[in-house]
Amino acid sequence: MGFYALLLIALGMSMDAFAVALAKGAAVRMPPRKIAATALVFGTVEALTPLAGWVGGFYAKPFISEWDHWVAFVLLGGLGLKMMREGLSGEAEDVRESKRESLWMTVLTAFGTSIDSMIVGVGLAFMEVNIAFAAAIIGMATTVMVAVGLTAGRALGVLFGRCAEFAGGLVLIAIGTWTLLSHLGLIQ
């Protein structure tokens, strides 16, 4: 898998966290230091969860290698549809919090937005990809997107939160479809 495909996956995976960051930014005014710390927590968690998913997928691979492209397609496509539905309906993660959110609550919120990345990690186990590089790209993209989301949230949270979720879902469906079609020899 090439760099640009990984970058698209990373941006797609960061959309959940971006949507939450927009909402947090709209609800709580944070100093730059707190924005940086929160973004790093989200990025770290988002980088670790695809590694965990990849390990599970890697060990399951010998048992389902004949269907691996279908597994990636179904996981990424299903996750993409879920994100699009949430983007349209507004069922995104709950962002209730106190003004002095603890590190523990930040980690839990980050984990809640990164469950999808674990599923992507399972799908990546069935593709030719350097998982450490992929996890690093996902983590960096999430760190940047959360920092941007928290900063811009006060003005843009209500307007773009749902659109970001929907766009992330579209990206995942496109990557899953590309994986399936390329494995079937329909595209290169």
Swiss-Prot record:
Keywords attached to this entry: Cell inner membrane, Cell membrane, Ion transport, Manganese, Membrane, Transmembrane, Transmembrane helix, Transport
Any GO BP: manganese ion export across plasma membrane
Gene Ontology CC terms: plasma membrane
Main location: membrane
GO molecular function, one term: manganese ion transmembrane transporter activity
Disulfide pattern: none
Locations listed in the record: Cell inner membrane
InterPro entries per the UniProt record, alphabetical: Mntp/YtaF, Put_MntP
Domain of life the protein comes from: Bacteria
Residue ranges of the TM segments: 3-23, 35-55, 63-83, 104-126, 140-160, 167-187
Topology versus the membrane: Multi-pass membrane protein
Manganese keyword on record: yes
The family this protein is said to belong to: Belongs to the MntP (TC 9.B.29) family.
Function: Probably functions as a manganese efflux pump.
Protein name according to UniProt: Putative manganese efflux pump MntP
Organism annotation: Neisseria meningitidis serogroup B (strain ATCC BAA-335 / MC58)
Lineage: Bacteria, Pseudomonadati, Pseudomonadota, Betaproteobacteria, Neisseriales
